[in-house]
């Protein structure tokens, strides 16, 4: 089992790092008391090999030896990787002023500045023990995400899940679509008597549509459009992209185009899914 511990000063980006880990398949727990780690890992045994835990100052031991004792209780086969995120006092002050959130150490007689400085002193011994120390003072959330991903994977590239979905306009447009293409202008197999009861997954319909120059040109142009912009979408920290293809009833043209695009992109590095919404109505 691989365990990633994320600690650091409040406001430095721990929640951002945890979201990256969640996208990478980690079972994530926010602000778990260290004494509960052993129990959590025992419960997750056989269910998840990737676990990430964020710990804030309220759950951290006051001495290094206490932390070492807690980690020593974990199963021997646990691979531990640790992060410490930090920012300058001025940056943290600005972030808290903008969000107007309450600092974990804020009390009636303690100012925000004093709470930030106190947290830094309390966490300083822990900061010296971690595998990766990240100063987020000059990083935005995308740059921090890339940095965490690069440490874990050796690359900033993100596995983008591309979901191609066919649908029929007569049943309504999918609300989750990022891109939507209308293929009702393409030659319609519905008007061929022998093709009408079939779908775009059946060979006779595929042969009919593959012989239409307009269909082939449309698929080629959509492929080029997506190939051009996918790298930019990935750098924008997207986890998935839904591309909807619609025709009148969602039986022939949209199903065929969706199927062909899914096959084309399956040859690349992306994880591709294909779904035919209206075929489930049968």
From Swiss-Prot:
InterPro entries: P-loop_NTPase (IPR027417), RapZ-like (IPR005337), RapZ-like_N (IPR053930), RapZ_C (IPR053931). Keywords: ATP-binding, GTP-binding, Nucleotide-binding. GTP binds at residues 56-59. The keyword Metal-binding does not apply. Belongs to the RapZ-like family. PANTHER family: RNASE ADAPTER PROTEIN RAPZ. Displays ATPase and GTPase activities. This is Nucleotide-binding protein Shew_3314. It comes from Shewanella loihica (strain ATCC BAA-1088 / PV-4).
């Amino acid at each position: 089992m691989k365990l990633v511990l994320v600690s650091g000063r409040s406001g430095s980006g721990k929640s951002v790092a945890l979201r990256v880990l969640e996208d990478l398949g980690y079972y994530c727990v926010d602000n778990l008391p260290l004494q509960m780690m052993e129990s959590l890992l025992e419960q997750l045994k056989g269910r998840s090999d990737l676990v990430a835990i964020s710990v804030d100052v309220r759950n951290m031991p006051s001495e290094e030896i206490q932390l070492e004792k807690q980690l020593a209780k974990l199963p021997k086969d646990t691979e531990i990787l640790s992060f410490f995120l930090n920012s300058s006092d001025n940056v943290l002050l600005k972030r808290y002023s903008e969000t107007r959130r309450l600092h974990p150490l804020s009390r009636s007689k303690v100012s925000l500045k004093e709470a930030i400085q106190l947290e830094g002193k309390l966490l300083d011994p822990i900061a010296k023990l971690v595998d990766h120390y990240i100063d987020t003072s000059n990083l935005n959330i995308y740059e921090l995400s890339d940095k965490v991903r690069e440490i874990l994977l050796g690359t900033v590239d993100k596995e983008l899940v591309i979901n191609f979905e066919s649908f029929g306009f007569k049943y309504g447009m999918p609300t989750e679509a990022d891109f939507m293409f209308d293929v009702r202008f393409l030659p319609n197999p519905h008007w061929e008597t022998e093709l009408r009861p079939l779908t775009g997954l059946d060979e006779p319909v595929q042969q009919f549509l593959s012989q239409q120059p307009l269909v082939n040109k449309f698929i080629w142009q959509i492929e080029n459009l997506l190939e051009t912009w996918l790298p930019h979408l990935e750098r924008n920290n997207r986890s998935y992209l839904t591309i909807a293809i619609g025709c009148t009833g969602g039986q022939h043209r949209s199903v065929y185009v969706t199927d062909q695009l899914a096959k084309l992109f399956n040859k690349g590095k992306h994880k591709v899914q294909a779904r035919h919404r209206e075929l489930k109505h049968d």
